C-alpha cells in the first residue's frame, strides 16, 4: 500500500511536490485544475524533475467539474477535449492512471441516459489512455443516490475502465455502511482510493478519526479494505490549512494498515 496526498491547485505545483517529498509521502495525487495546474500551462519538465528528486510516484486527477455527461452534445464534446488535454499532461509527468469524476445531470432524464452519456465520452478516452500506457479511473461523486448502479453499468460497458473509490463521498451519499458496499461490488476493478472524514452532511475533507465516536470505525474500515485484496495507492484528502492534520492522518493510516 502506498500513501499520497493531493496538491492544492491554487499553489505552485513544484513547491507542493517538494513538501510531500520532504514529509515522507509515497506519491502525489496530481490534480490538473486551474488556476495553477491548468493542463495547457503545466511546466511538465519542472514537475517531472521535482517528482524524480524525491522518488515520488504520481497519479493524475482531472478537474471534478468537467461535465462529461452534460445533456448538451457540444458540452460533452468539449468535456472530452478537456480530458484529452489533461491526459496528455498525465502521460508526460509519468502517471499510471487519471481519475475522472462521475458527473451529475438534471433529474429530468431516464437512468439509461446517465450511463449512455458517460460511456460516450469515457470509451474513447480509455482507448487513448491505453495507447499512452495509462488507465482512466471513474470516481464516485458525493451525494448522488443511485449512482452505484449507474457506475456498475458504465464499468460493464468499458472493460478497460478502472474504479476509484472515495470514502468521503460514500458517507455523504448513503452513510457509513455504503463504503463496504462499493468495495464488495467493485473491488476487482478498484485501482485507487481517497480517504477523508466528514459528518455525512457534505464532503468536508476532514482529518481521519476527527468525528465523534459512533461515526466511522476507521480500523475496521481499513481491515475490510485490506481483506478485499486491495494493496494499491491511497490518497489522503485532508484539506486543512494546517498540514499537521494531514501528517497525523498519514500516521494513523499506516498504523491501521499494519494492524489489519
Give residue ranges: language-model regions.
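Acidic (Asp/Glu)-rich catalytic clusters
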Residues: 17-24, 39-60, 85-94, 123-131, ...
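N-terminal pre-domain/capping segments
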Residues: 1-87, 91, 162, 251-260
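Short, solvent-exposed loop/turn segments at secondary-structure boundaries
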Residues: 39-42, 70-75, 109-114, 174-177, ...
